[in-house]
Amino acid sequence: MFSNLHLPLNPIDKVNQPPVYYLQVQDGLIICSGLCWTTAYILYIRQAYRDKSYGMPLVCLCANIAWEFLFGAAIPESAAQVVSFFPWFVIDIGIVYTTWKFGREQWKHAPLVAQNLGWILLGGIAGMLVMFWAFLKTYDNRYEAGFYLAWTDQIIVSTTSVAQLMSRNNTSGHSWGIWFTRWIGSVFAELIFVWRYWNYPESYPVAATHVTIFLFIVTEVADLTYPFVYASLDKKEKKKLK
């Protein structure tokens, strides 16, 4: 009964008409990635209330909101994108709120930022929306444009999360759960494109470009650096409590 079930076809799959097993593996990876990232976003909000802080760096939060609004609501390419990205957009609004609510304390060393954090968030989101829209209008291949925007956003999330831990010198706003679900979600996302390229290289050349390989490698290096930095800071914090 369920052997032929799969998510609605994306534009490339409509042309290729791949076998059901290909679609189901692809769908499984999409669903796993989506569930992991959804969990990570919820954990960001929970940790914000626990620590009275925020964990997602400002630049990548603004980029996330812009990307998820564009591809989850404004100009989605498929029903699968709406199902995946619009819920993230809704949850991300909660992250924006907790960042605004608790972020001012984190920026008390920079009063100009602390006093204008709401405007900085609004301006950052608006700026990212315009920049992403301009990139999509400039790039002929919308699929590849969306891909590069998504993975540029991803590399920003991964690298700035490590940088934020190091600059704060504490783990406030962060947790092992956030890191693990975010990292595994990214691994599943990478595997989606590996699977697609393995089966249809002529349809997904973007997955094997030098830029893509760079984005994937740097993302993994940053994500695998994070736990070492977090563990070091967590150990110091626990020593202080003794």
UniProtKB/Swiss-Prot annotation:
Primary enzyme class: lyase
What positions does the record give for glycosylation? N170
Please list every transmembrane segment annotated in the UniProt record, as residue ranges. 25-45, 55-75, 80-100, 116-136, 175-195, 211-231
The EC code for this enzyme is 4.2.3.-
Q: According to the lineage, what is the superkingdom?
A: Eukaryota
Report how it sits in the membrane: Multi-pass membrane protein
Pathway terms, separated by semicolons: Secondary metabolite biosynthesis; terpenoid biosynthesis
Which keywords appear in this protein's UniProt record, sorted alphabetically? Glycoprotein, Lyase, Membrane, Transmembrane, Transmembrane helix
Q: Say if the entry is tagged with keyword Iron.
A: no
Subcellular localization, as worded in the UniProt entry: Membrane
The record, for Pfam families, names: Pyr4-TMTC
Q: Which family does it belong to?
A: Belongs to the paxB family.
Known function: Terpene cyclase; part of the gene cluster that mediates the biosynthesis of the phthalide-terpenoid hybrid 11'-O-desmethylfendlerol. Within the pathway, mfmH catalyzes the last step and cyclizes the prenyl unit of 5-O-farnesylcyclopolic acid into a drimane-like structure to yield 11'-O-desmethylfendlerol. The biosynthesis of 11'-O-desmethylfendlerol begins with the NR-PKS mfmB that forms 3,5-dimethylorsellinic acid (DMOA), which is then transformed into the phthalide 5,7-dihydroxy-4-(hydroxymethyl)-6-methylphthalide by the cytochrome P450 monooxygenase mfmA and the hydrolase mfmC.
Q: What is this protein called?
A: Pyr4-family terpene cyclase mfmH
